[in-house]
Amino acid sequence: IISVHPESGPHLNRTLKRIRELGAKAGVVFNPSTDPSVIQWMMDEIDLILVMSINPGFGGQKFMHSQLRKIETLRKMIDATGRHIELEVDGGVTAETAPLCISAGATALVAGTAVFKGGPTKYADNIRALKGG
């Protein structure tokens, strides 16, 4: 999967089509300020949507709860297509925010700090906590 930010080029639809023509799956990355409507007419070209629930740049930031509504909106857009499009969330994912993301419609989570905090002896406990048990 090759994912691009809508803001990174002038023709998102052409970029997504080209990625797929070259044999890769295509993804779109949403920064916190990116509106979901930007992909409204190109859902057939998308295989993955990644919602950044923090402003990209460094780990350990707090989850932006305002992104839950965006996840819900994107889930509705995906469901309307009848296609399987992964909906992934990255940024501030913790044992507390993971269930909120899943309830909002996410199908995959990226967790860095929540997995690695406390060092290798804590990884298993941290992963269990993310899974809800």
Describe each region flagged by the PLM.
Residues 49, 74, 90, 101, ...:
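Conserved, mostly hydrophobic/aromatic
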Residues 102, 116-133:
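C-terminal helical cap(s) of enzyme catalytic domains, especially alpha/beta-barrels
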Residues 13, 64, 99, 120-124:
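Conserved strand-to-helix beginnings and helix N-cap segments that scaffold or border functional pockets
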Residues 1-86:
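Conserved anion-binding
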Residues 1, 26, 108-109, 115:
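A short hydrophobic/small-residue beta-strand
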Residues 55-57, 92-96, 115-116:
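Short Gly/Pro-enriched loop/turn and capping motifs at secondary-structure junctions
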Residues 34-46, 91-109:
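Catalytic cores of alpha/beta
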